[in-house]
Amino acid sequence: ALAAARLEQLLEEFNITRLREAPAMALSGGERRRCEIARALAAHPSIMLLDEPFAGIDPISIADIRALVVQLRDRDIGVLITDHNVRETLDIVDRACIIYDGRVLFEGTPEALVADETVRRVYLGEGFAL
């Protein structure tokens, strides 16, 4: 009974009730991401890993996923994001890491990352702006 109630709560919260019976292959990228996050939350995690959450989804879904990440953070759920989409990620994180050539090149605040000359030279590009 508790699991069924939790399922209903998550389906409503993530606006995916209509997808309950849909096969995974029929879902859009954004719908798939919302289902993945809701499924992970069913286990009441203290931390979540989101691997490339902004890859292959439309701008509206990107905004939705960004809002979900902020909601997770507001629930005191740690969120670790691995993604190449720096613009979509930097303004919703407290800390960022750049891994380059198999090693941590930089770790710090998003502001410090964008200002770092080495990061700009080897990863972001000199003309990068948020």
Annotate the PLM regions.
Residues 37:
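Hydrophobic anchor residue at the start of the ABC signature
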